[in-house]
């Protein structure tokens, strides 16, 4: 055997080993960063501080008694920080789900230096209670935030304060009539909650099947349904999820349904700007849920984020996974988004590529469907044979072809 051939083969083996080590090491680093634990001591302190605020009437909400008085909502552990947000896992005994003990998630961006919002400065009487003008000011401020989330049904809401909170404000005032500033406490608590984008979106859109259940609030903290990604949406390196293609196809269909809802189910499109599989989870009803709605933006809000003073290339008009288009003649980002949620989901979740270690959600399809499915996924992720950063939209026709094909695969499996 020629020496040159052996040298080439040895170099190939060494190259493959280096690639393997880099991929494996990168995955370990990614897991370490993503799963870095918050401080247990700090988390317990935050819960103690919250209960202290409840005892002094600075915090209120329907979950405060369960957390602080009856101990029906018990802190279990903390998990990783996401964008400055505290995410704590708790055990909920008969409060979140009547007659059952379930896991729940306690979330808040407070207290965090990055979590800043304008103080709620309302006109008050000398004893701390709101004047009629102060009450009207709060109503108008809260209504403007509510308008950013819903336009079609806002006029049907008779009590904005109670709609945005976990308690009936008037009842809370009656039950705390000896506490003159009870109304102001309610307003401050609501204000601290609705300044958190995730809370506002999920509270307002609880009727959507892909939104985790909102169990309630205490102070600036909100308690939600526990819906972990599981091994299918967040598989471990090498071991994978061990799931069948049929199981993964069902989840893919749920995600496609969410895409359709975000594109067409609201008064204007809602854009996903941080698309990755672990940002979805499986709820108690076995439906796929969106876990991180901080990265969801209504189209009007999205265009404000893309509104640069000027742009010289398309990258200037990007906002994370939401990609814009620069009109070079005017130097302005266009008001029409150049790609949609469907394209991003196909590229970042469904197909195989190096960043997911060639294990997209729809990897290894049944052999009899490969020739039909793989080109369709390619067309979905890279419309019109796009290369690099994709800025072309994926057509609705591709959506329906993919949706119907996955249903057929499940039916015939």
Map each language-model feature to its residues.
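Conserved beta-strand elements of beta-rich interaction domains across eukaryotes
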Residues: 95-97, 109-114, 219-221, 228-231, ...
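Conserved structural core of kinase catalytic domains
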Residues: 132, 137-197, 210-255, 300-302
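Activation segment
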Residues: 229, 283, 287-289, 294-305, ...
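Helical subdomain adjoining the active site within ATP-dependent kinase catalytic cores
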Residues: 2-49, 76-79, 317-413
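Catalytic-loop of the protein kinase fold
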Residues: 259-292, 297
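Amphipathic alpha-helical interaction motifs in eukaryotic regulatory proteins
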Residues: 196, 200-206, 215, 256-263, ...
């Amino acid at each position: 055997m020629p020496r040159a051939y052996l040298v080439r083969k040895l170099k190939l083996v060494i190259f493959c080993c280096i690639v393997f080590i880099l991929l494996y090491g990168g995955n370990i680093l990614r897991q370490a960063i993503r799963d870095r634990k918050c401080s247990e001591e700090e988390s317990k302190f935050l819960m103690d501080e919250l209960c202290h605020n409840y005892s002094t009437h600075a915090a209120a909400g329907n979950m405060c008694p369960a957390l602080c008085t009856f101990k029906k909502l018990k802190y279990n552990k903390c998990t990783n920080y996401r964008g400055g947000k505290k995410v704590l896992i708790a055990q909920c005994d008969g409060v979140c789900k009547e007659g059952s003990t379930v896991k729940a998630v306690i979330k808040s961006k407070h207290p965090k230096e990055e979590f800043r919002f304008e103080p709620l400065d309302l006109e008050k009487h000398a004893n701390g209670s709101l004047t009629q003008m102060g009450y009207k000011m709060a109503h108008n401020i809260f209504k403007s935030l509510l308008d950013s989330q819903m336009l079609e049904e806002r006029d049907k809401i008779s009590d904005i304060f109670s709609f945005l909170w976990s308690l009936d404000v008037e009842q809370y005032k009656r039950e705390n009539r000896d506490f003159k500033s009870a109304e102001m406490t309610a307003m401050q608590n609501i204000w601290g909650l609705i300044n958190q984008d995730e809370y506002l979106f999920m509270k307002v859109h609880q009727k959507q099947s892909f939104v985790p259940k909102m169990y309630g609030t205490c102070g600036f903290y909100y308690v939600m349904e526990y819906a972990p990604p599981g091994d299918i949406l967040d598989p471990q390196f090498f071991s994978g999820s061990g799931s069948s293609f049929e199981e993964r196809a069902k989840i893919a269909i749920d995600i496609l349904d969410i895409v359709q809802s975000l594109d067409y189910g609201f008064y204007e499109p809602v854009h996903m700007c941080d698309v990755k599989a672990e940002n979805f989870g499986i709820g108690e009803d076995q439906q796929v849920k969106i876990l991180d709605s901080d990265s969801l933006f209504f189209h009007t809000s999205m265009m404000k984020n893309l509104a640069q003073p000027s742009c010289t290339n398309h990258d200037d008009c990007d906002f994370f996974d939401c990609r814009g288009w620069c009109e070079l003649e005017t130097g302005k980002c266009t008001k029409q988004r150049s790609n949609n949620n469907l394209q991003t989901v196909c590229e970042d979740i469904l197909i195989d590529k190096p960043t997911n270690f060639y294990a997209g959600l729809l990897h290894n399809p049944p052999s009899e469907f490969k020739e039909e499915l793989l080109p369709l996924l390619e067309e979905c992720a890279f419309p019109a044979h796009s290369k690099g950063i994709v800025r072309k939209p994926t057509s609705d026709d591709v959506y329906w072809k993919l949706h119907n094909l996955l249903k057929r695969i499940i039916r015939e499996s």
